[in-house]
Amino acid sequence: MSRVEAVISDFGGVLTSPLLGSFAAFTESSGVSLEELGKAMAAVAARRGVNPLFDLETGRLSETEFLGSLAVQLTQQLGRPVELDGFGERYFAHLEPNEPLIDYMRELRGRGYRLAICTNNVREWEPLWRAMLPVDEIFDVVVDSAFEGTRKPERRIYDLTLERLGVAAGAALLIDDIEINCEAAREIGIRAVWFRSTQQAIQDTEAALGDGTGS
């Protein structure tokens, strides 16, 4: 098996605190439960024929359009007006950088590995998430689904990331908190670490790197 030359990190839930905490804070401030939010998403998806989150994360749907359709559905479900304006700002207000993992990425760069962020994200949120860590100081490549028109676990976003890193699939390792994204990466030959905790992810990454030195 080829030596790992590049490490690809997810953003939300890996380089940040768990996403569930931000969703929980939003539901508390809005009075909309996660269950109701999920029901609204499913109803909008049934009408559109596609999950609206997928279109949001591939730039086919703006944040305003996405939140507007959910607000209309939630208003119908709950029988009261629901406003979702400022969702992104409220969401990021409760998201914290995962400093130990960010420091580990910085260490890997110093050890000679090429680094990338491959994120399913929202076009309008780019200034918010980039403000959370020194992206350009640590990472060689950023692949953001909202600007590429493809999202994990679709193969094309992995291929784009590998191409921009200049490495073959067998020389790359992905760290992601979504298991299906890890499985999709493995299917094309990328090693993958399923992130469940910072300590576990670092240990599993070190084990996968083997000799601990990049090319």
Explain the meaning of each model-derived region:
Residues 10-13, 59, 108, 117, ...:
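Generic structural signal for small/hydrophobic residues in well-ordered secondary structure
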Residues 91-96, 120-121, 150:
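Short, flexible loop segments at the rims of nucleotide/cofactor-binding pockets, characterized by
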Residues 1-5, 9, 122-123, 127-215:
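Asp-based, Mg2+/Mn2+-dependent phosphohydrolase catalytic module
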Residues 110-112, 189:
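Glycine-centered short loops/turns at secondary-structure junctions
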Residues 60-61, 113, 147, 166:
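Residue-level recognition of short, well-ordered coil/turn positions
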Residues 2-102, 110, 207:
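N-terminal helical cap/lid subdomain that shapes the substrate entry/recognition surface
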